[in-house]
Amino acid sequence: MKIKFINYLLLFFIIFLNYNGFVKSDCYQELDLVLSNSCRNGPSKLVIHESIYSFESIELTPFVQPKLLNYYSWDLQDGINYFISYRYKNCSNIISKPFASKGMYYKLLAEPLCLNTYIPVRVYNWGAGGIEYNFYSVPSTIWVNSQNGLCSFQSPISPQSYTKGVLNDGALKFVGPTCGFKNGTITIDLTKGYSNYHLFLQSDYLFDNEIQPSSEGFYNGLESENYSLFVDSEQCATERIEIYMKDVFAPLEIDFENVPDLFHNSTISLSLSSGNNGILNNTNINAFVIQSERLLTDWNHVQTQITSNTYYGYAYNKDFSTEAGQTKCVYSETLLFDNYSPNFNFTISKSESCLENVSITFYPLPNQNIKVYDYSSESGIPFSMKDNVLSVENNLNLWIFDTNQNYGIVHSTVFDIPSYKIIETSNGIGCWKTYNITIVNYENYKNLRIHFYNENSEFNFYPVEGVFINVPALYYYVTYNAGDCETESYFVIDKLDRNTPMDNVVLEFNTLEIGNCTHETSFMVTVKSVFGSYSKTMQTFYDKEFTIFLPNCSCQINGIYVAPRLIDGDSLIYELLTDPNCNSTDTLIRFTSPSQDYSISSVYQNGVQLQYYNNLNGYYISSGENNITVNYEGDQYCYRTETITIQSVYEVPLVQITPVSDCRNPNGKIEISNFQIFYNLELVFNSNSKPINQGFIENLASGTYTINYYSNQTCINSITVYVPSSENVAEITTSVISNPTCDNGPFSDGMIRVALKYEGNQINNFTIQNQDAEFTYLNDGVYPIAGVGVNSLTISYLSCIWKRDITTVLNKPSFTLEKVFNDTCDLQSVYKLVSSNPNIEIDYIDSSNGFSYLNNYYLVFQNSGDFGYYVAWNSRCYEYYTQQIIMDNYDRDSNVKYIDYEIVKPDNCNSLKIDLIITNMNKFISLTIENKLPTPINSTHSIFKNLPPSKSYDILYTLLNGCVAYQTVGIDEFKSGFTKETIDIIKTSDICYSGKASIQLSNLDFDNYYYYIKNSNSLMGVTDSYDSIQPQQSGNINGTILLSNYNPGSYKIYRGCKSMANCYLETNVVIESEDPIIESISVTDSYDKLNNGTVEIKLNYNSPYPINFKIIGTQLSNQNGKFGNLTPKTYEVQVTLTDRMCPVTLSKSFTINLKTSPPTPSPQDPSDELSTSSFVQVNLLFLSILIFTIFIF
């Protein structure tokens, strides 16, 4: 009994020593605090290299979340004094210690009130001490390098107001000097609350030499330099304004005495806007026009060719000398000539027969070289013309091209175009829609059909009595033969819709034949949809993404077929190179690929990949039955599999394991049933060996052991066995504290909690380890590096080990960029990185545009676009992200328009000069168009005079706050032409899709202009087809012409000038189809009691089909709309149209009134009286003869 007690005492002492291996023996030992200071993109850090298992508790004040690795790490904010408090394991005392990082940080010594407020900034830990900077022009970022240049920081600053300040409220104005002179001025309006102004050259870095004002708030005599102006105000404190004083030139005016046109000379005159009385005049400067490449001796009536490359200006020596090589002042402007097309004047002559050619006569402009091609042909050979007359057949698309302008238009010689109506007949969405398409006067067209191409297939739909019924959404080619045409014509109706709602779509796959290394797998996919089922057979070696275009509609179905692994049915080709022997139970085997087209990519034995030994040219496989899979790769991937049995020369131990059931007194056991056949057996654990006598060994702790077995005295081999722990003695519960936020292999940033009870008691001092890793954690049951998926953990306590698989899922954060301040002008835009998961700790951003400050992370952008950046977080995660950045700065694509303007067009083409008036000039420092300066009118208005015609003008402007950008003007104004002229248009709408609409044009001048009508409907497969309007058409009286028989659609009426390129007019006309209406009801009232009222109903449409008129409540009905013998009362007439294009019913009320006497007859002319008198005399004679005859008989 005494010996047993001593044994228990020794066991307790051993356990106590093992437990306290994790406990500090010195409870008062101070920690070694390792501080790393922030430098460039990394924050300051505190690291403690002591094992995390040494502490009962540890914490920073102010609180900072630690990063748990095998040690503690914290990210710190510079400028904060911290305390660290900690208590060692098995100790009761708490130790506290102050510390602070020494990374650089700053404090603003003044508030950034306005954009240009001058701000003193104090930077700490810059070197041995601090340093002060003066900062201005916010929003921007402070960027400071340390004294030794090894570290830096960057931080965003934005002002409290973007709208206040000496620039924004117009209190500061400056005018640059005339080139070569010192007459620049700066004016400060002190009445707006400004004072204490000081001016320096920017090159005066120490601000020692102040420039004195000429008078209060006014500087004069300034030369072209860069200046720094300091101005004080209550609203913005001290502002620092950078003024770039540029040379100013007197605007040069150009007067077009005839309109600029391509490829021939124009006449221009030049003058200075300041006249000849200013500093500069035509006697001391030299003007030039660089197209003629000469200086002008006379500025008036200059003959020169003008193109879009023409520029003009003037130059002079700064001292007005005539010596060569002196410093020059040069001013130039570019002519914004933008030739407007089309510029083709032609007339068309067509026959009533389609078999006769179309004759087209062209009237070229000067220097115009016209070629005509077949638009649908790929030959590139133009048609031959004689004397500018072209004869071509009907139903062609012609490409009319000017080789000098490098521009062309399309004209279609289609013989006849059917009218049609399209009505949706389904309630579907997207490509599931269906339509009825009705062709007007379909009897006039032969071979009507809808031709449709879908993927590599063709489909045709045919009409029933001119109606294509329930046609799916398509891009229709409606083909036909018109009249006596032998050539087929077509027009296009676009009802294509790629939106494929998948709610009612089912994909079914059927593998028809599994492939092998040389033949693809064949499968069939069946699409079940609202249009029925459709099947398609495909072949593939791999997983296949596919798109199926359903027949007869525009729906395309996307899917993916997961191909089975391709297995080769042949046997493996292999060779056994060695036999098992005493030194190895493995056999060296070599595999051969089935053909020279394939190579062996990998070999697996019982699901475990085998290592290839280059020096031996083979693989080792173990004795016994082996399921071998050999993977091949060539043009595709495939595999062969086979069972290979290797007979072992020697026996192996047959092992039976008894688990550990007592963690304090290990009682695991290994038994070997065939121990008699071995020469010797021994157990190896942690490099220590112990003999196995009588075939068993006991009192083992849980763990992995190696059994060495000797077949004879010299032949030794080994096997590995694992002794588990009994599940009956422990209660283990696991839970996921947080899922990993990145998929970083088996070790990520997920956290798993493990709770252990042994013999009913809660256990705290156990370890957790991943079975595949060397990381061991004793952290109150927390495993902090869990990966995505299954985490195989071992839980160890005393002599016991248990295994658990815990599954986690990916909880990946998203990162977005949140704008810190608005981007303005050329200043940078700063965005802050924001995570969707506030619990993660960002480590750094890896980007050329990135920086961090005080544990916040930023990106800087100068323009719009898609930008990429890497983000690292939680010490273990790292990923690449992209985000689209759309800047709000000033550019021509911005929705913000700052320039208010008016465009004054000339009255007509005789003086084609454009004036552009700026009406808010007081909002800008400067405005230019290709260096051209406007002429001031007053404080708010200025004018660009005599601009050459162009589709638009790009104005370069500088706002009062210094922002420089472009704004494009004139696009909308010039769509209708360059003059104030108009074409008077009266249109009549189409009715019932009859194609009978008309367009009446007035104010036409066929002597000086030519006219197009541009059809924007898709015709012969081409949109924007041009047709010439010819003066010989009917209705051409006094400049008025009537265009008849037009279908519903969008048209443009275009007028071009016969003598110049840019004088055009363009007007949009939209024709819609309307239902008929009751145009009039003519009523004759009933008199006395005769019930003799009448009515006549007329429509605004003469249908070729019967129209039924019926008076409701009576038996009266007919097809001419005339009714008589009506009694006095109110009636309702109902009109029913049987027209197939618009089967509508109309109704309207009318009233027959009762009159007491007939209306007074209107006076008759003598011929009417004579006719009545003769009629009476004839009747009296006839009556006398009748009486006499009766008397005789």
From Swiss-Prot:
Recorded superkingdom: Eukaryota
Chain segments annotated as transmembrane: 1173-1193
Glycosylation sites: 90, 183, 226, 265, 281, 345, 357, 436, 516, 552, 583, 627, 712, 765, 822, 938, 1038, 1092
Keywords: Glycoprotein, Membrane, Signal, Transmembrane, Transmembrane helix
Disulfide bonds: none
Signal peptide limits: 1-25
Topology of this chain in the membrane: Single-pass type I membrane protein
Cellular compartments per GO CC: membrane
Protein name according to UniProt: Putative uncharacterized protein DDB_G0271238
Organism from which the protein derives: Dictyostelium discoideum
